[in-house]
Amino acid sequence: MRVLGIETSCDETGVAIYDSESGLLADQLYSQVKLHAQYGGVVPELASRDHIRKIVPLIQATLKEACVSPQEIDAVAYTAGPGLIGALLVGASVGRALAFAWNVPAVPVHHMEAHLLAPMLEDQVPDFPFIALLVSGGHTQLVQVNAIGKYALLGESLDDAVGEAFDKTAKLLGLEYPGGAMLAHLAQQGDPDRFIFPRPMIDRPGLDFSFSGLKTAAALTIRANHQDEQTRCDIAYAFEKAVIDTLAIKSERALEQTGLTRLVLAGGVSANEKLRSKLSVIMHERQGKVFYARPQFCTDNGAMIAYAGWRRIQEGSRSDLSISVHPKWALSQ
């Protein structure tokens, strides 16, 4: 089965084709980072308009890359939420129209479920159940995954998502949007002993997160110190270390509470090398295994939507022709 996947939840237009026998056949991605950088964040109206401009050429390029004709597509999967409503409607409308024109099923996909499944695109599929740590610009969640579509939320951020905290702190350090990856690069040159930031909520029971206080601690430190290059590196190191330690502590706590030995790391922040390394060490010590995707499949992309669509079809998921999107959509719903 060949599934065309469409991703337009925020500021990336992604289109891909996944073949259930051959794997990923084609993957095209257009990023709007340069468009939004001058505003310091995503402008929803501009994002929607840019998706409209790029989506059809990307679909054509994807079909060409895969050497596949429309008649050889068996289903169309598209992101139905969560995300920016205008951006979601672009992908949903095009996806539905193509499915109708090609007389194939249309499959709405939950964006965070697609992130959760992304490591399985190329790696072995972990046995159920397992713990998933979902870390992105809009979400920070610990989820027990019992089967496709059967999710139990164990903990989540009570305020800022971890990716949002990275980007906001990067902005305070004078880095361009999106600054999370730049902050991680600065941190490589940081002095590990100069600043120490709090690890939020690790002394409380439960698996929820909070990053607003950590962001405030970073902001106060930035204001209190001269902003030479080394100081910026030192602050970046302290911030990143605090975030990674917090995520690792909560993840290990989730594993202990559930007795599980498999951990999936997914979402844009899962591309962070120090986070990957930290969790790999923890899972090795626990005689378990951590799964994560290649960096290119950690951020938003069409490949994860195509794959998630195929997995949903295997579970019997189908949809009518109505165009329905969900800007807010709990994974457990």
Curated annotation (Swiss-Prot):
Keywords, ordered alphabetically: Acyltransferase, Cytoplasm, Iron, Metal-binding, Transferase, tRNA processing
Cell compartment(s), UniProt: Cytoplasm
GO molecular function: iron ion binding; N(6)-L-threonylcarbamoyladenine synthase activity
EC annotation from Swiss-Prot or TrEMBL: 2.3.1.234
GO cellular component: cytoplasm
Gene3D superfamilies found in the cross-reference section: 3.30.420.40
Transferase found in the keyword field: yes
Ligand binding (Fe cation): H111, H115, D300
TM region(s), chain numbering: none
Pfam family, one: TsaD
Main location as per UniProt: cytoplasm
GO biological process: tRNA threonylcarbamoyladenosine modification
Cofactor comment text: Binds 1 Fe(2+) ion per subunit.
Catalytic activity: L-threonylcarbamoyladenylate + adenosine(37) in tRNA = N(6)-L-threonylcarbamoyladenosine(37) in tRNA + AMP + H(+)
Cofactor: Fe(2+)
Residues that, per the record, bind substrate: L134, V135, S136, G137, G138, D167, G180, N272
Similarity comment: family membership: Belongs to the KAE1 / TsaD family.
Functional description taken from the UniProt entry: Required for the formation of a threonylcarbamoyl group on adenosine at position 37 (t(6)A37) in tRNAs that read codons beginning with adenine. Is involved in the transfer of the threonylcarbamoyl moiety of threonylcarbamoyl-AMP (TC-AMP) to the N6 group of A37, together with TsaE and TsaB. TsaD likely plays a direct catalytic role in this reaction.
Name used for this protein in its record: tRNA N6-adenosine threonylcarbamoyltransferase
